[in-house]
C-alpha cells in the first residue's frame, strides 16, 4: 500500500478495487462485484464504491487503496508509511484496521514507518535500517529496540519524542 493509496483517478473506488481481479483472475463480473463489495466492506468503504478518489479524504483514499491491495487475498501486505499525512485519530484507526486485516486474513504485514506509536501498536518485530550504512543495524521487538539497543542511531530514533519535547538543547 503506497502512502497516497495510489488509486487511478479516472476510475471509481469500486473500479479500482475490481481492476486486479479483472486482470489476474477469470472470475465472472458478478462475482467480481461481490468481491469488491466484500473488500470495501472489510475496510469500511462500501458506501464509497461509486465515488472517485478526488471525492475522498486522505484516510478514505488509503482505505480504498487497502481494499484494492487485499483484492487478490495476498499472503504478504507491504505498507509504505501508511499513516503519513493522517491526523492522530485517523492514523490510530488505520493501525487498528491493519491489525484486524492481519488477524482476519492471516497475512504477513511488512511496514516501513517512522511513526513510533504505530510501530509499537502494530509490530511484533522490527528491523532498523540505516540509510548511510545501507544495511540492517538492529533487530528486535519495538520495546527491545527502545529499551535495550545500544546502537546510537537506533537509540536516537527510538527516543526522539523525548528529544523533541525538551527542545534542541534539552532546555525544555
Show where each model-derived region lies.
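Short coil-to-helix segment of the ABC ATPase nucleotide-binding domain corresponding to the Q-loop/switch region
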Residues: 11-19
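A short, proline-enriched helix->beta-strand linker immediately N-terminal to the Walker B motif
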Residues: 71-75
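Conserved beta-strand-loop-alpha-helix hinge in the C-terminal portion
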Residues: 132-157
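Conserved ABC ATPase signature
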Residues: 52-56, 60
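Helix N-cap at the start of a conserved alpha-helix in ABC-type nucleotide-binding domains
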Residues: 88-90
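Catalytic Walker B motif of ABC-type/P-loop ATPase nucleotide-binding domains
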Residues: 77-80
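Helical segment within the ABC ATPase nucleotide-binding domain
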Residues: 92-104
Amino acid at each position: 500500500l503506497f502512502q497516497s493509496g495510489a488509486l487511478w483517478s479516472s476510475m471509481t473506488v469500486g473500479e479500482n478495487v475490481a481492476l486486479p481481479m479483472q486482470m489476474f483472475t477469470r472470475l465472472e463480473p458478478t462475482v467480481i462485484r461481490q468481491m469488491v463489495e466484500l473488500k470495501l466492506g472489510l475496510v469500511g468503504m462500501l458506501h464509497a464504491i461509486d465515488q472517485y478518489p478526488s471525492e475522498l479524504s486522505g484516510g478514505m483514499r488509503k482505505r480504498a487503496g487497502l481494499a484494492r491491495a487485499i483484492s487478490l487475498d495476498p499472503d504478504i501486505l507491504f505498507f509504505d508509511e501508511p499513516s503519513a499525512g493522517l491526523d492522530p485519530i485517523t492514523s490510530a484507526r488505520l493501525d487498528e484496521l491493519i491489525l484486524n486485516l492481519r488477524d482476519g486474513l492471516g497475512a504477513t504485514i511488512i511496514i516501513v514507518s517512522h511513526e513510533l506509536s504505530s510501530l509499537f501498536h502494530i509490530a511484533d518485530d522490527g528491523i532498523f535500517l540505516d540509510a548511510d550504512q545501507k544495511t540492517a543495524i538492529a533487530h528486535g521487538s519495538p520495546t527491545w529496540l527502545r529499551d535495550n539497543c545500544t546502537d546510537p542511531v537506533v537509540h536516537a530514533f527510538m527516543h526522539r519524542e523525548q528529544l523533541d519535547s525538551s527542545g534542541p538543547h534539552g532546555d525544555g
